[in-house]
Structures are given as C-alpha cells and as structure tokens.
Amino acid sequence: MFVSRLAASGLLLLALLAVSLDGKPVQQWSHKGWPPRPQIPPLVVQQWSQKPWPPGHHIPPVVVQEWPPGHHIPPLVVQQWSQKKWPPGHHIPPLVVQKWDPPPISPPLLKPHESPAGGTTALREELSLGPEAALDTPPAGPDVGPRGSKAPAAPHRLPKSKGASATSAASRPMRDLRTDGKQARQNWGRMMNPDHHAVGGGGGGGGARRLKGLAKKRVGDGCFGLKLDRIGSMSGLGC
C-alpha cells in the first residue's frame, strides 16, 4: 500500500512538469536563439599567441612557422626565393650550394725563382754551382807564397776525382788563410817584442840561452812545413 502511494505521487509530478513546460524548450533552444559565439582566430594566430611574445608583435612568415623549434632557419633570401617573392631574372643557388660553395681561390704567390728581379736569379745560379764555384775564387788579401815570398800563389781548383783527394783540395784555401794569419801574427810579435828580435847569439840573458836551445832542437822548422824565425819559435805566435 505504501509502495503504491509513492508510485502515484511520482507519476503526478511528471505530469505537472510536462504541463508546465508545454513546448518552451523547443522555442528557447532553437537555432536562432543561440547566444552569439566569439570570433575564432585562424590556426596560425592561435599558435603564435601561445608563445611568450609581447602583444602586437609581427607574426613571422609561414616558412619560419613551419620549421620545428631548434632547427636551423635558412637565410631570408632563401625564404623569399621559396615564396617566389624575389624579382624575376635573379638566380639564387640552392641552399646546399650556398653552404658547400668553396671560397674563391686566390692567385698563387710568386716564388723566389719566378720573381722578375735579377738578384734572385743570380743567387740561384751561384747556389746551383755548389762549392766548386766558391773554391775557384782566390782568397782576398795579398797573395803570399809558400815560404813568405811575394810571388802570387797559384789558385787551387777542386779536382774531378772523388774521395780523399777532393777533401785535401777543398782544405787548401783554409791552409792559405792560416798562412796569412801566421804572417800577421809574426809581424805583430816583432812590433811588441823588439828586444827579443834584436838579441844576438852570444848574449848572456835567459832569452838568448833559450834561443840557443831551441836552435839546437830545430824547433823552427816544424809548422806546416814552413820555416819560423826566433820570435815565432820563442813566443809561440808562429803557429
């Protein structure tokens, strides 16, 4: 009995609700009765507005928007060329060619043997001759003979044979230079020690006795085969 009363009251409420509405929902939610919707911006503007850019900032071209974040953006010239905004007739190479285009090759520098000046050419000829050209030139200074004579010494030339003979011939100019230096030292010794040079064979000083002893031992004949005087043998300036 209690359950039947509840069911009857529920049915009564539903009937009253249907009578109170009576077609009002159809009139209220019809197509003309929709509230005005807000203007939806394009998708590009929506994506740009989500970035932390200040309001009113210029929106970049579509090419820049299509590049993923962190990717290298091509130069503006390539972007304009891809959008066909470049003036006609102007050739722009592809991006790969721009990246891998080698730098212009500079003209090679002039080498020393290719220089127009004549000084380097003469120097190159002297170097190409080798040590033979240097040995053929006689040493500078007064020419002194093998035993101190004033006769000019014959120039020494390097023989064509190889081995020990070539080495000895190459050392002859150095021996001539040593001979010239020895003569200069002897002259300097005579100027510095005139007393020793003027001492005779019968003096009683220590210098005279030393000269007699050296004369007996024949020390004055042994400096590169050249004869030495008393000044050189006593003072050691001869060799």
Curated annotation (Swiss-Prot):
Biased composition (Basic and acidic residues): 173-183
An example Gene Ontology CC term for this record: extracellular region
Gene Ontology terms describing biological process: cGMP biosynthetic process; receptor guanylyl cyclase signaling pathway; regulation of blood pressure; vasodilation
Highest taxon in the source lineage: Eukaryota
Record PTM Pyrrolidone carboxylic acid, positions in chain: Q50, Q65, Q83, Q98
Pfam families: ANP (PF00212)
PROSITE patterns attached to this UniProt entry: NATRIURETIC_PEPTIDE
Subcellular location: Secreted
Residue stretch(es) of the prosequence: 24-33, 43-49, 62-64, 76-82, 95-97, 109-136, 148-217
Signal peptide: 1-23
Residue pairs linked by disulfide bridges in the UniProt entry: C223-C239
Family to which this protein belongs: In the N-terminal section; belongs to the bradykinin-potentiating peptide family.
PANTHER family, per the entry: C-TYPE NATRIURETIC PEPTIDE
Protein name: Bradykinin-potentiating and C-type natriuretic peptides
Native source species: Lachesis muta muta (Bushmaster)
